[in-house]
Amino acid sequence: MVPYEYYVALSGLLMVLGFIGVIVRKNIIAMLISTELMLNAVNVAFVAFDMKLHDVVGQVFVFFILTIAAAEAAIGLGLIMAIYRMKKDVDVEKLTELKG
């Protein structure tokens, strides 16, 4: 069995990669994918600590986070589609107007 420290390290690596993706990318869709990667990093950490503590609370939190992530992705993609229809672009640096 793989020690839980490896899962925690993997979770940290995924979190850092997701954070770098949010900071570096200029495309809104890539930023949304990076945010989802960070949420999945939290899920891996919860499951790793759940393995160590022999409790099911971590797995319950994972189900809640997956539900929230699905709702966030649906709302985010809907907003991105609306922005694309208005501006014909999804580049963050070109979306500086607050006018409706």
Curated annotation (Swiss-Prot):
PANTHER family tied to this protein: NADH-UBIQUINONE OXIDOREDUCTASE CHAIN 4L, NADH-UBIQUINONE OXIDOREDUCTASE SUBUNIT ND4L
Annotated InterPro entries: NADH_UbQ_OxRdtase_chain4L/K, NUOK/Mnh_C1-like
Gene that encodes it: nuoK
Function summary: NDH-1 shuttles electrons from NADH, via FMN and iron-sulfur (Fe-S) centers, to quinones in the respiratory chain. The immediate electron acceptor for the enzyme in this species is believed to be ubiquinone. Couples the redox reaction to proton translocation (for every two electrons transferred, four hydrogen ions are translocated across the cytoplasmic membrane), and thus conserves the redox energy in a proton gradient.
HAMAP family reported in the protein's UniProt record: NDH1_NuoK
Record field: catalytic activity: a quinone + NADH + 5 H(+)(in) = a quinol + NAD(+) + 4 H(+)(out)
Listed transmembrane segments: 4-24, 28-48, 60-80
EC number, as in UniProt: 7.1.1.-
Any one GO molecular-function label of the UniProt entry: NADH:ubiquinone reductase (non-electrogenic) activity
NCBIfam families: PRK05715.1-2, PRK05715.1-3, PRK05715.1-5
Subunit relationships: NDH-1 is composed of 14 different subunits. Subunits NuoA, H, J, K, L, M, N constitute the membrane sector of the complex.
Gene Ontology BP annotations: ATP synthesis coupled electron transport
Record protein name field: NADH-quinone oxidoreductase subunit K
Highest taxon above the source species: Bacteria
Similarity annotation: Belongs to the complex I subunit 4L family.
Compartment(s): Cell inner membrane
Keywords from the UniProt entry: Cell inner membrane, Cell membrane, Membrane, NAD, Quinone, Translocase, Transmembrane, Transmembrane helix, Transport, Ubiquinone
UniProt organism field: Sulfurihydrogenibium azorense (strain DSM 15241 / OCM 825 / Az-Fu1)
